[in-house]
From Swiss-Prot:
GO CC list: cytoplasm
Gene name per UniProt: rsmC
Top-level taxon: Bacteria
Location in the cell: Cytoplasm
Keyword vocabulary terms for this entry: Cytoplasm, Methyltransferase, rRNA processing, S-adenosyl-L-methionine, Transferase
Record organism: Haemophilus influenzae (strain PittGG)
Pfam families given in the database record: MTS, MTS_N
Functional note: Specifically methylates the guanine in position 1207 of 16S rRNA in the 30S particle.
Enzyme class: transferase
Protein name: Ribosomal RNA small subunit methyltransferase C
NCBIfam families in the cross-refs: PRK09489.1
Taxonomic classification: Bacteria, Pseudomonadati, Pseudomonadota, Gammaproteobacteria, Pasteurellales
Catalytically driven reaction(s): guanosine(1207) in 16S rRNA + S-adenosyl-L-methionine = N(2)-methylguanosine(1207) in 16S rRNA + S-adenosyl-L-homocysteine + H(+)
EC nos: 2.1.1.172
Complex and partners: Monomer.
Alphabetized GO MF terms: 16S rRNA (guanine(1207)-N(2))-methyltransferase activity; nucleic acid binding
């Protein structure tokens, strides 16, 4: 089953005939691969590991170097990420580059006209399946340097840590209140192997390493920009840790004494229960005997039922009117 966006693109297959095509953005299906016989070549660039690991020949990275006759960009709900990727693609393209932008209306694709107007001609060419399809021709190349997109912040809770983040990373500009509550439960007694799952910019893992220097820190995420941010947060603060891509536990090796997470409770505009359910239901297979799973979550979400089902009991280590920090032992 292909996505709504790809269903709209199917109505315009003549754009693809004999061309080299680069697919980028929030692709979520195998539509690009189905066009292999129609196009002269196909490239796929995604910053999402949960997609990249399930499809063939996907370039999973923060930056992409490549040329194509036609670029097809799938608009995402993350506007900062969209701007970062589109500017990067335009900066390395040639004048006259043809781009199709497709996205769901509810994800804000209508704003593409304002976003790209300074760089060329853009026109809406189709509207169907609650999506908009736009055609763009490049006339004025923007300048793009990755170093210009780094943002930093500090917070009294972080004890002189500086957090580094790229566009689109969760809590990129400031410490979110859920993570702040989770950090209030961290002390220097933490030891052994620690997994910060869904690490974002590396706030939690870096803070644990700072407070408990002997802990062995591993950080994982599905988002390429998050992984790059976590690496830079560690290195710029002279901290050691391992950072790599994993879709929940897909690429996790070994067992841990603590798995800690501020898991996503929404995926853009949809609640992301799948990730949290996998985290809770599979955690015990990745914990050492006596190991702990510690997560922060919105108080209204039904996590206690899952925790009780798979771990028999749980503790609430800290709470506010909005968030709770849950702890279970293996």
């Amino acid at each position: 089953m292909i996505s709504l966006e790809s269903q709209v693109l199917e109505r315009h297959l003549s754009f693809f005939d004999g061309k080299s095509v680069l697919f980028a953005g929030g692709i979520s299906d195998n539509f690009p691969q189905t066009l292999a016989s129609k196009c002269s070549s196909i490239q796929i660039w995604s910053c999402y590991f949960d997609y990249a690991r399930t499809q063939s020949a996907v370039n999973f990275s923060v930056e992409f170097q490549g040329q194509a006759d036609l670029i097809v960009y799938y608009w995402t709900k993350n506007k900062q990420e969209v701007n970062f990727q589109l500017l990067q693609l335009l900066a390395q393209a040639s004048i006259g580059q043809e781009i199709l932008i497709i996205g769901e209306n509810r994800c804000g694709v209508r704003s593409v006209e304002k976003t790209l107007a300074p760089y060329g001609e853009i026109a809406k060419i189709d509207s169907a399946r609650r999506c908009g399809l736009y055609h763009f021709s490049l006339q004025n190349k923007p300048h793009f340097e990755l170093k210009n997109f780094w943002r930093t912040y500090q917070h009294s809770t972080l004890e002189n840590l500086t957090i580094y983040s790229l566009p689109g990373v969760f809590s990129a500009a400031e410490l979110d209140t859920g993570t702040e509550l989770l950090l209030s439960t961290i002390d220097n007694k933490i030891k052994g192997k620690v997994l910060d799952l869904g690490c974002g910019a590396g706030v939690i893992g870096s803070m644990i390493k700072k407070r408990a220097p002997n802990a062995q820190i591993t950080m994982t995420d599905i988002h390429a920009m998050a992984l790059e941010s976590a690496r830079k947060t560690l290195s710029e603060n002279q901290l050691q840790g391992e950072v790599y891509a994993s879709d929940v536990f897909s690429d996790i090796e070994g067992k841990f004494d603590l798995i800690i997470s501020n898991p996503p409770f929404h995926d853009g505009i949809d609640t992301a229960y799948r990730t949290v359910k996998e985290l809770i239901t599979q955690a015990k297979w990745h914990l050492n005997q006596g190991g702990e799973l510690r997560i922060v979550a919105n108080a209204f979400l039904p996590y206690p039922e899952l925790l009780r089902q798979y771990f028999n009991d749980y503790q609430v280590l800290a709470q506010t009117g909005k968030f709770k920090v849950y702890s279970v032992k293996n």
